[in-house]
Amino acid sequence: MANNLEQILREKLEILLQSTALSLSSQQKQQLVKLVLLLNKWNKAYNLTSVRDPQEMLVKHILDSLVVSPYLRGERFIDVGTGPGLPGLPLAIINPDKKFVLLDSLGKRMSFIRNAVRELELTNVEPVLSRVEEYIPDHKFDGVLSRAFASLKDMTDWCSHLPVNNGLFYALKGQYNEDEIKQLDEKFTIQQVIKLDVPELQGKRHLILIK
């Protein structure tokens, strides 16, 4: 059954990628499928995501993360409130030249991420178990990523110590919410709002770049 599921996921991933401008190596595709298989396996015991169907995971978790990749500027990124490593793990897989710190305060999520990093042999990921406001990095980041983590105001307030001077906040959101934008501290400005196209995903997705 596992081999059959793996084949189904490989074929599904190929179809999904054809609807994007992303170009992935066969190894990267293999790693992404393996990540879904790991998430599916661990999810049964640890309840890491409400998405139960592995094919849905490809759309709602993997592709939803990958479409951010073309907009990443810089080399060092932190994914705050990463949950089961989203969007950090998929982005790390297809950006081996960039470094990613994956931060979350829940132990079971970090156990999964550490296991995934080992299984996928990722050398550009550092899992960190911590609350974001208590985390003091040795070096600041070119980009601070968040997906379903907090409001824009909370994200920028809690994470203001993390980016370099010209660093960006990358907030993955569903609806583009004007009220959320208005609540931002005046020291932050919206650089760009990008409407993301995620193959087979129902509902709107936006990437909001904040400086």
Curated annotation (Swiss-Prot):
Catalytic activity: guanosine(527) in 16S rRNA + S-adenosyl-L-methionine = N(7)-methylguanosine(527) in 16S rRNA + S-adenosyl-L-homocysteine
Catalytic EC class: transferase
Domain of life: Bacteria
Listed GO CC annotations: cytosol
Documented EC number(s): 2.1.1.170
UniProt subcellular location: Cytoplasm
Keyword Nucleus in record: no
Entry-linked Pfam families: GidB
InterPro entries, sorted: rRNA_ssu_MeTfrase_G, SAM-dependent_MTases_sf
GO molecular function, one term: rRNA (guanine-N7-)-methyltransferase activity
Annotated S-adenosyl-L-methionine binding sites: G81, L86, V132, E133, R147
Keywords, alphabetical: Cytoplasm, Methyltransferase, rRNA processing, S-adenosyl-L-methionine, Transferase
Membrane-spanning ranges: none
Sequence similarity: Belongs to the methyltransferase superfamily. RNA methyltransferase RsmG family.
Function comment: Specifically methylates the N7 position of guanine in position 527 of 16S rRNA.
Protein name, as recorded: Ribosomal RNA small subunit methyltransferase G
Species in which this protein is naturally found: Actinobacillus succinogenes (strain ATCC 55618 / DSM 22257 / CCUG 43843 / 130Z)
Gene: rsmG
